[in-house]
Amino acid sequence: KLWVANGKGFSSKANPFGPSPVRAKEEVISHGASFKPGDQVEYIGGLFKGSMSIIPVPTDKDLVAYSKAVYKNVPYSIAKTNLADSSAPGFPIPMKQNQSSPIKYVFYVIKENRTYDQVLSDIPQGNGDTSLLLFGKNITPNQHHIAESFVLLDNFYVDAEVSADGHNWSMGGYANDYLEKTWPSSYGGRGGTYGGEGQREIANNKNGFIWNQCYRNGVSYRSYGEFVSAGRPTLSILKDHYSTKYPSYNLAITDAYRFQVWKKDFDSLLALNKVPQFNTVRFGNDHTEGLRLGRPTPYAHVADNDYAVGLFIEALAKSPIWNETAVFILEDDAQNGSDHVDAHRSTAYVAGGFVKRNFVDHTPYTTTSMLRTMELILGMPPMTQYDAAATPMWKCFDSTAKPFVFSAIAPKINTKEVNTVRNEWQQKSEKLNFVMEDSNNDYEFNKILWHGLKGNIPYPAPRRAAFVTPTEKD
């Protein structure tokens, strides 16, 4: 017999009663998720039910059947490749590695911890539950405009659970065995360290990350804040390939300021005709600090983050390289929120000259789908079996580049508004550590955010869904 232990069980689930950065009774914690006995928490780190399977040692015939079953369950297939609408001349996403693309510059923006329902559930064309909405169009007008002007992605899922594995998934196409097995302990307050983002060599991906892949394939690259700590890169591959002035994760620095630093660097590189082919940019203030007294409110943090994203798209849209540019934006994970489909469903955006306009795409995509699409554009092979098997985002692109007339929408709320209410939830926020993302109990953090923004409305409970397959009715 084979005894197979599976720490993640058979499925993820929805979590309408998941964490919330605006719930008054909830702590916002970075790198931690300890729970009190009896807590009914739909925190992503606690949704998985481990399993033990006892199966006969498979025969050769069994292995063939098992392999076919696995292949059938993989979203990507050769048949789907053949169905991709890529026959038009000039289609920008190659079907195979080393085919040329008219897109010459890729910008990859990484944000922090939001679910789809928290931000975009108020867009009627998408599959959203507005009862879980926290940061709707009034707070995130730029992201709404981007989603509605380009492609609304309402079936996008992050591959990771938390930031520890999330940044490694986002940059490397997987998190290694050490990291996957240790983050539950460190986040649960039972010992261990963060490890991710290059913090510990043992937690790094064996063959490196997407920057290593760029180096191996002669693709120029630069990082703004991603895998950078205290002003220094955490990976040797980023030496001489990062902005020394761009702030790394620090909630005391606004994302709007980060944009200004990036813009100055971008303009100088543009003038020299030396803009790298691949650029990673970190805008992480949508993480928020809960109700911490004297610190920006959750709404203020998210509005600041949204404005930075809007300014970023405006700058690229007005630049001479727009028609040769593709922008991909995602969250590293979706742990700090609720979603009625799945705790991994998150916001994602695609923009650029060749990106379709006013289009809704219900295709199931994941973090590795985005990675695979960028790899195809840049003429690089997949890094792992996960991005190799992911469905590329072909449906999001068109064969003709178009301009995009856009000016960033100024925040509709005061981004300097700070938390002033003194209550037990504000007091809990004072005890939290925001020096690094995910250093706190995320369930408590989400409850603080939820009740802080929603008052006494009951905290939303979990759903299991590997992917959602929309029907015509949907």
What does each of the following model-derived ranges do?
Residues 11-12, 52:
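Structural signal for beta-propeller blades
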Residues 65-474:
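N-terminal pro-sequences and low-complexity stem/linker regions of secreted or lumenal proteins
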